[in-house]
């Protein structure tokens, strides 16, 4: 698959409220809804805004699932987690999130994609693509973001 980018307005993504938790499906499918964002594999990504004392569940229809606490404190499985924590759930385990204070949580999951290779800021399922990306980066052939193009980090020599 070729690299790509697409922008989707938040208002165009499925949103719902249940038990005072406001959720938006950013990508994939969950709870009978499907986002318009094109994906390359089965997955879900949900943004959940949780008032204090509310509860939400992580969909369990994919083998790999996690929750990232973007803000606030939550309780999951009797343990307390805070801003910046990532919780990975065992396959098939029930996963409920309780907000101990106002919290924002990203719920993510999907199916394994196969082997991935990582080198510096490059991730691919192909070693050859990583080598090409390293060469393109070092030669200045990669376009930097419009609003973040003044600093250029050299590829680290190992």
Name the predicted role of every residue range.
Residues 1-158:
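Jelly-roll (double-stranded beta-helix
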């Amino acid at each position: 698959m070729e690299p790509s980018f697409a922008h989707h307005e938040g208002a165009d993504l499925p949103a719902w409220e249940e038990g005072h938790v406001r959720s938006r499906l950013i990508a994939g499918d969950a709870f009978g809804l499907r986002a318009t964002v094109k994906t390359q594999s089965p997955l879900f990504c949900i943004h959940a805004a949780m008032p204090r004392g509310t509860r939400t569940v992580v969909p369990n229809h994919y083998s790999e699932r996690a929750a990232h606490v973007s803000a606030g404190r939550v309780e999951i499985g009797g343990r307390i987690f805070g801003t910046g924590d990532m919780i990975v759930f065992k396959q098939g385990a029930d996963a409920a999130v309780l907000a101990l204070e106002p919290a924002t949580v990203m719920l993510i999951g999907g199916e394994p994609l196969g082997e991935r290779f990582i080198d510096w800021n490059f991730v691919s399922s192909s070693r050859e693509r990583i080598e090409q990306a390293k060469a393109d980066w070092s030669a200045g052939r990669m376009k930097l973001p419009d609003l973040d193009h003044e600093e250029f980090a050299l590829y680290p020599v190992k």
